[in-house]
């Protein structure tokens, strides 16, 4: 799988695109999400730079990221509310990757939404 991987603390140049990262495994209450989008948050650069090293040390190699949007690829045997093909949002770790394994308690359905007519640009 492809992912953005960090091998040591430092600036953005320390983030590396890698093609052969092992895919996360699922079990029990885990949902496997094929990521379509991931956010970049202030905590990501704080972790990457080592600024949060005392209270949140990283184990290298590390995949950063906290939020993901995507499509469920597979679910663990005890997952009751999601199925393959569902569009979801999740809060997790290691979201700068093609696939993200998340406990189902941190996943929610992504609702279809369009701009109300009066807000659409003309």
Regions found by a protein language model. Name each.
Residues 90-122:
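NAD(P)H dinucleotide-binding glycine-rich loop of Rossmann-like/cofactor-binding domains
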Residues 1-2:
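Extreme N-terminal starter segment of soluble prokaryotic enzymes
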Residues 5, 23, 47, 101-102:
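Conserved hydrophobic "DFG−1" position in protein kinase catalytic cores
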Residues 10-16, 42-43:
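Short N-terminal binding/cap micro-motifs at the start of the first secondary-structure element
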Residues 5-8, 49, 72:
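Residue-level signal for short segments within beta-strands and strand-turn junctions
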Residues 17-20, 99:
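Well-ordered beta-strand positions in beta-sheet-rich domains
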Residues 43-49:
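Cytochrome P450 core scaffold surrounding the K-helix E-X-X-R motif
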Residues 22-39, 52-94, 101:
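Glycine-rich beta-strand-centered segment in the early N-terminal region that forms part
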